[in-house]
């Protein structure tokens, strides 16, 4: 009887350990960032067609398209995810005052405090780095932007995200890397 009781106690302790261990492992996997990563990797993409400049951007279907009509800016669109984190995709058109692509990239890298410049092609480049607002670093946020030069204008597709969510961003980085504007090349 003592052996049975001892075996039962040991068995119950093992079962309790397994249940608690499984609960902790499962809890770690279901962080908001991990949930976002799964969601963004599986999400179908929607398309936004800009009525003013004709460019197209894709964005995850669970992002909300914001009303940008009050901004007064032509060629501007904004898509956001604000559940546990603020993740913003923006597309816009801006004047290009530089004569060369490199001069344009250097000027914008300095203005945006970007840490690196990647030339995506002979008409496009990517800037990334910490986010600054009015010259002050926005703690914990970074940007990843693609600029496509077309004559005297730049088409821009931009991602702003929390640094803690960077492991969940590869699909959005690729979305921006692969973005093209018809007629700009």
Where are these regions (language model features)?
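Hydrophobic single-pass membrane-insertion segments
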Residues: 17-29
